[in-house]
């Protein structure tokens, strides 16, 4: 799509979300028969409107295996932006994904809360995450309800859904 075509579509379709569409298409390709469970932040809670939520939401995919695959919405440019069109990175240049070994319905939304905290950190400090990074945490369990011994995070590229262009 050319810059002119992009601008025309942006004007003609004010609720167009090319970044979100691209993310959904990538996950639909990987999980073609799965309808994700979506969690959206309230519009008035989003940082863009004065709130403290830096993500628009999450989608949780049942993989048909022994884990759920979660993707965030909001670390990359979701909505049309002439400034982002053709740029090297779309907003922060990535969405976060996480694979968790149990259903969010069984254990609450701890993984979504953790991803929201990581997004808040990035937006407030300007520090973003790259593959190979390690987040040590404070020594306490990331999931105390389950009695997990995991106390930190290793940042890796998603091996299930390949990187995509969102703008």
Segments and roles (model prediction):
Residues 1-167:
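Short linear motifs embedded in intrinsically disordered, proline/glycine-rich low-complexity segments
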């Amino acid at each position: 799509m050319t810059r002119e075509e992009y601008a025309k579509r942006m004007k003609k379709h004010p609720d167009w979300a090319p970044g979100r569409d691209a993310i959904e298409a990538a996950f639909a390709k990987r999980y073609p028969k799965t309808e994700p469970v979506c969690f959206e932040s309230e519009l008035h809670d989003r940082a863009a409107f004065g709130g403290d939520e830096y993500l628009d939401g999450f989608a949780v995919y049942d993989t048909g295996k022994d884990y759920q695959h979660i993707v965030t919405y909001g670390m990359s440019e979701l909505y049309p932006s002439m400034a982002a069109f053709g740029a090297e990175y779309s907003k922060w240049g990535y969405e976060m994904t996480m694979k968790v070994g149990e259903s969010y319905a069984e254990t609450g939304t701890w993984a979504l809360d953790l991803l929201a905290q990581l997004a808040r950190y990035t937006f407030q400090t300007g520090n973003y995450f790259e593959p190979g990074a390690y987040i040590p945490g404070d020594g306490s369990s990331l999931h105390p309800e389950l009695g997990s011994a995991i106390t930190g995070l290793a940042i890796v590229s998603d091996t299930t859904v390949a990187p995509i262009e969102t703008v």
